[in-house]
Amino acid sequence: MTTLLSTIHSPEDLKRLRRDQLPELAQEIRDRLIECCSITGGHIGASLGVVELSIALLYEFDSPGDKIVWDVGHQAYAWKLLTGRNEQFPTLRQEGGISGFLKRSESDHDQFGAGHAGTAMSAALGMATARDLKGEQHKVVAVVGDGALTCGLSYEGMNNAGHSERDIILIVNDNGMSISPNVGAISKMLGRIVADPRTNRLRERIKGMTFALRGVFGEGVVDFAKNVEESVKNLFSPGMLFEELGFRYFGPIDGHDLQKLCDTLKFVRGMTGPRVVHVMTQKGKGFSFAESNQEKWHGLAAYDPVTGEARKKSSGPPTWTQVFGAGLTALAAEHPELVAVTAAMPSGTGTSVFQEKYPERFFDVGIAEGHAVTFAGGLATQGIRPVCAIYSTFLQRAYD
């Protein structure tokens, strides 16, 4: 039996489908991801969560003419399936196979290759600036996970994008997780935003009334309307960080409702200036094991898709990570001044054991390696003995 997915070799093929066929395609993509990753392993959790978003982006935008920039690539497996790499997908992360991340040399649809989180906004702004310098008209979209919003680089990009007033779209994929649960004020702010469509409707009505009343009451009504609009924003969306940075905000939107996603992206595509679409997704969507243990299923080796168990059970000695975590926890019992610091990876660094036993002495600062190291330095000046556990490749951003 021919599947919808097997007929799609490019975004043009996807656009030939009717909208009512897209949910069926989404299920086929999830089945394909679960099947292939059970053999190759991979970052399946986030990719399962953005299946509908991937479909909607390719359905409403014109990649590779429009530039879609995915942050990191952990989210981009469905993107690969829909952009001509379905047949190659069983070679994911294998020697001679396709990359587990986005790779410009692999596809014209992979606009930017990166291993660090937080780069998409700045890269997208660079592309939008280049477009304007060359007098071109295409759209530029940055897809950023809420985990990357714990990254200072994301805000450097957003700050410059809002100030530039360039035509650029930021899509926030909000699943409440990066690798481990997100931390910090930004994560809490996203969690407080109210999903109420009355916000944008009311703001548009205020603008309409302003123009109608200007002729009667003069320019003073414009200032009054602006104050009312500001109050509306704060009432429905506490904080409104994005609007303060110069972005027009839309959302939150159910990231698994294809009709709503397509309608919203089509509407936002027709606008200009910096704008942000806040999309709520579930990490591991459609795979019960990944839904129930999102941290474990962020990325893992081969597994049995029926039981969720690893295909190869280790019967050997403990790993270096396990030894490190156990040793650090043992030392903490003897040294009350010892604390642990990590950057969004307690499980990956082995410090989750320390976290469970000494939560008040454990600090997960999110995807903020530079802050982690400097924060640890501040602790050390006051007689505390911090152990800062970060993957070596991520530590590159904190050398200074």
Predicted regions and their residues:
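Acidic, glycine-rich active-site loops and adjacent beta-strand->loop/helix elements
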Residues: V72-Y77, V144-C151, V172-S178, K283, ...
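N-terminal amphipathic, basic-rich helices that act as targeting or association modules
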Residues: M1-T83, L241-T281
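A glycine-rich helix N-cap at a beta->alpha junction
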Residues: E87-L102, H163-S180, R198-R201, F363
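Non-catalytic terminal/interface segments that mediate subunit docking, oligomerization
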Residues: K67, T281-Q396
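Long, well-ordered, tryptophan-enriched scaffold segments
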Residues: N175-F324
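Hydrophobic, small-residue-rich alpha-helical packing segments that form membrane-like cores
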Residues: T119-V144, A148-A195, E204, V232-P238, ...
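Short acidic, glycine/serine/threonine-rich loops at helix termini
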Residues: A78-G84, L149-M158, I179-I186, L190-G191, ...
